């Protein structure tokens, strides 16, 4: 069987798929993995044929910061989807026609994979390394007000971008056709149903395979003291003041501290390092977590999953809305506590609380047990094989809007933007914005009435 996989250039989205690649290859399948040069080494080490997407268009090279915006900044995401899809169109469509893959597997943020699969009518599997997302789970996941406002103000530009996709033969009715998976899309989610918010609202097309972790290469020895691990991940980790506060908080603590500060942090600039603390630009996180008793984390999905797999309770310090959602879930299930402030006193108090809370440790262990009960790479590979054996199926895209519907949407969106801006103003300006918003809202309904009359 031939499999084409697509991913964004992010370690947190790539790493969970590598075990699946190895499992598929062990079953005699061939995998072509479309990603970015920064991921070449680990993808080729897993045994896949690596195809560099950034070779097709120099403008496609994504920074780590841009990768982190995918899926969070909806306006940016839509523009990127169109740009990447059009850049890949000729070459990748030709590749797919030549390779004739039995199935396409696309990261949930590599939306172009789904568009290509639909265009060529090839069976498709969504690979979801974050929580699965639907209307119900979206209600409990935080969103950025600024991102939503940016999306609303960019709707006109977004719709023009989608027209470019339609001209190339991509069936796209609205941006929601790209950004949302439906209940009929075969999907692999790299967590357990127990950890997934609103898990009961997802259909049987969703396989919760659990985290797929690599073996620990070089195990660390257990210390006679509690081990505390501190890391803010691989993307947004340049926070020297936070690291200095951790050093101040724990310099005389009766514990072994291991702190990973990222490649871009100058360790010498952090000041004197106490004897009980080890500071490195990068560590073998799996090896450290395997012997840790507490983890101070930014709450990236992979980091949290790895910690819970080993039953390590968490001190939660989320930096983005997505990480806030993961932190909220950990807190709701009783496996971690929020860091109240990033001051030395608060950090020390939070770590002491986590180290001394048997209930947190028990909840973390329970979630780790739920991960181990999942099918892992074998379950993910089974889903991919099963999808490849079925005819391609895609839900019909939402119909393209009529001119009247477009006018209604534009006027209604403008009204909503004015009302949102009014929330941050006062006095006469606020009253004017509210009046204008109400008038435009009425105008939107008039367009709706007139459009219905024409149908």
Q: What are the language-model segments listed below?
A:
Residues 1-51:
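N-terminal subdomain of nucleotide-sugar transferases
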Residues 21, 104-106, 280-328:
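A donor-sugar binding/catalytic signature common to diverse glycosyltransferases
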Residues 29-32, 36-227, 232-255:
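Nucleotide-sugar-dependent glycosyltransferase catalytic domains
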Residues 344-424, 433-440:
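C-terminal amphipathic helix plus adjacent low-complexity
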Residues 439-455:
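Membrane-helix interfacial anchor on the cytosolic side
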Residues 51-59, 127-129, 299, 316-320, ...:
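Short beta->alpha connector loops at strand-helix junctions that form conserved
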Residues 225, 254, 265-282:
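Nucleotide-activated donor-binding/catalytic signature segment of Leloir-type glycosyltransferases, i.e.
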């Amino acid at each position: 069987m031939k499999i084409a996989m697509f991913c964004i250039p992010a370690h947190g989205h790539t790493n969970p798929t590598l075990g699946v690649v190895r499992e598929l290859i062990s079953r005699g399948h061939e995998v072509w993995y479309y990603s970015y040069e920064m991921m070449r080494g680990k993808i080729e080490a897993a045994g896949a044929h690596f195809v560099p997407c950034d070779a097709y268009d120099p403008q496609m090279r994504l920074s780590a910061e841009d990768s982190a915006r995918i899926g969070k900044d909806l306006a940016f995401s839509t523009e990127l989807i169109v740009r990447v899809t059009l850049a890949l169109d000729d070459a990748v469509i030709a590749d797919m026609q030549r390779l004739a893959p039995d199935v396409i597997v696309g990261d949930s943020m590599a939306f172009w994979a789904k568009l290509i699969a639909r265009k060529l009518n090839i069976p498709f599997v969504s690979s979801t390394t974050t929580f699965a997302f639907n209307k119900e789970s979206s209600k409990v996941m935080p969103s950025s007000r600024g991102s939503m406002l940016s999306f609303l103000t960019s709707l006109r530009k977004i719709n023009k971008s989608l027209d470019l996709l339609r001209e190339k033969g991509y069936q796209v009715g609205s941006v929601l056709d790209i950004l949302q998976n439906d209940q009929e899309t075969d999907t692999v989610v790299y967590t357990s149903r127990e950890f997934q918010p609103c898990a009961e609202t997802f259909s049987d097309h969703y396989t919760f395979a659990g985290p797929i972790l690599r073996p620990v290469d070089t195990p660390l020895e257990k210390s006679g003291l509690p081990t505390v691990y501190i890391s803010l991940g691989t993307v947004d980790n340049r926070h020297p003041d936070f690291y200095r506060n951790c050093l101040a908080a724990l310099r005389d603590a009766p514990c072994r501290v291991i702190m990973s500060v990222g490649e871009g942090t100058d360790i010498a600039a952090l000041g004197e390092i106490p004897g009980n603390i080890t500071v490195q630009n990068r560590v073998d996180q799996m090896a450290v977590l395997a012997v840790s008793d507490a983890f101070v984390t930014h709450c990236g999905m992979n980091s949290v999953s790895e910690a819970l797999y080993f039953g390590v309770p968490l001190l939660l310090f989320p930096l983005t809305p997505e990480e806030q959602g993961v932190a909220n879930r950990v807190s709701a299930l009783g496996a971690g506590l929020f860091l109240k402030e990033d001051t030395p006193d608060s950090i020390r108090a939070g770590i002491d609380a986590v180290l001394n809370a048997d209930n947190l440790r028990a909840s973390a262990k329970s979630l780790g047990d739920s991960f181990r009960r999942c099918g892992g790479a074998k379950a993910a590979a089974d889903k991919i094989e099963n999808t490849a054996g079925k005819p391609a199926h895609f839900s019909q895209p939402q119909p393209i809007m009529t001119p009247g519907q477009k006018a209604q949407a534009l006027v209604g969106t403008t009204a909503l933007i004015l009302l949102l801006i009014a929330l941050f103003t006062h006095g006469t300006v606020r009253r004017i914005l509210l009046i204008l918003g109400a008038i435009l809202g009425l105008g939107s309904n008039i367009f709706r009435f007139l459009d219905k009359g024409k149908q």
